[in-house]
Amino acid sequence: MTSTTSEPAKLQPSSYIPLMFALLTAVFAFQLNASMLSPALATMEDELGATTAQIGLTQTAFFTAAALFSLFLPRWGDLIGRRKVLVGMMGVAALGCVASAVAPNVAVLLIGRIIQGVAGPTVPLCLIMLRQQVLNEQQYALLLGIVTSVNGGIAGVDALAGGWLAGNFGYRSVFWTMAVLCAIAVVAVQVFTKESTATETPRMDWAGVLPLAVALGCVLTAFNEAGKLAEANWFLVIILLLIGAAGFWAFWNVEKKVADPLVPVAYLKQRRTWALLSTTLLTMTGVFAVMNGLIPNLGQDADAGAGISASTISWVTLTPYALAGLVFGPIAGWMASKLGYRYVLQTGLVGTVAGLIISIFMVGVPNAWTLLFVSIFLGVTYAGIANIMLNGLGIVLSPADNQGYLPGMNAGAFNLGAGLSFAVLFAVSGSFEHGYRAGMIAGFIILLAALALSFLIPRPESIDDTVAAVNARK
């Protein structure tokens, strides 16, 4: 595609600073809901008199709800107003935080966490809203890198803050902190962002939403159950997977018949959809449980690993990993504006594959320094490059007439890949004598498949119905 139209002018700081403040506040609010609670789980067990399994279920409920809401809320924003939907998400999430903060028992806490899951598609919706107000491609790529890197980068810091709050004021203070930030986000988004919708705004395809949500919910639950390995109810896993397959089949058939589908079948058949979603799914499956499970576990293993204490391991692995992604994300965005999103994605994937090769050899000499090196390396290549580009491609590949479907489904692929990663890599790890190395080798093989699939993702500049292409013709 070529165009003689000049590049749109960059926004001035007086325009993009308030916009970024609003969007980053919303991203902060969501990320606190997702990760700030992690170090407070033991405190919650004590204060509520609950079991580890019961508290774990509330976490699973939050992430499952976040995945399901991500499927359709971005598209609903296309139709009724993106700012309206984001403000509503933050408001409802604040109510969920309050419900969790005052919960007298685990049952009420579970309901509160499900309500908080409404904030699930915050990042893709923020990126779509950013796309509407920042028309200059280079400036958009840089700001996209900032938004997405902040989303992952604060995960290592807010967990520390959550642990401090829970230790000094009880776990309920963590939820009150979340509620306050959600309330601030409501005001900031309403005041500092502009409302936008798709050019055409037909009725929402709720008939398509239902089977898709059932399908993804069943598959996610099946993977969570499978992740229990020896304790898993495998009959339940099979039933859930069958229901999930039936749900996807029903969704496909509904989309072929309705006048205004959630996702037109023509889009589902295009490489921008299935190649991107497959790459996201395989990338997450290959790396997520390595960085969030195998490497921290290896670090704490007194026999086969480094024997680092539970209170210290995050400082050696997850925190530097997240901070490396935070620092490098904006650089990746700038690189994408110069070299192209797909090329930078593949650079990140090659680097992540290299990081897993290093990790495989590192298993033989585990110590704090090797763990720190691998964590920073993967923080740059995956969290700072590949993850940023996968999120960005979901935005820049979307057709101008349906900007919400691909980011929403991509968010579902991220969540599905995270669940599948723990189920597959931990199953492999538990099946071999040298379990840590076996799990990492499995992740390495899956990442190679993701890299191969990434070559099927079309370059955004080769598609003539994206927002950038439409703007270029104006």
Where are these regions (language model features)?
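Extracellular/periplasmic helix-loop-helix junction of adjacent transmembrane segments
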Residues: S38-L68, V106, I308-T317
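Helix-breaking motifs and short loop linkers at transmembrane-helix boundaries and internal kinks
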Residues: E47-G49, G81, A101-V108, G170, ...
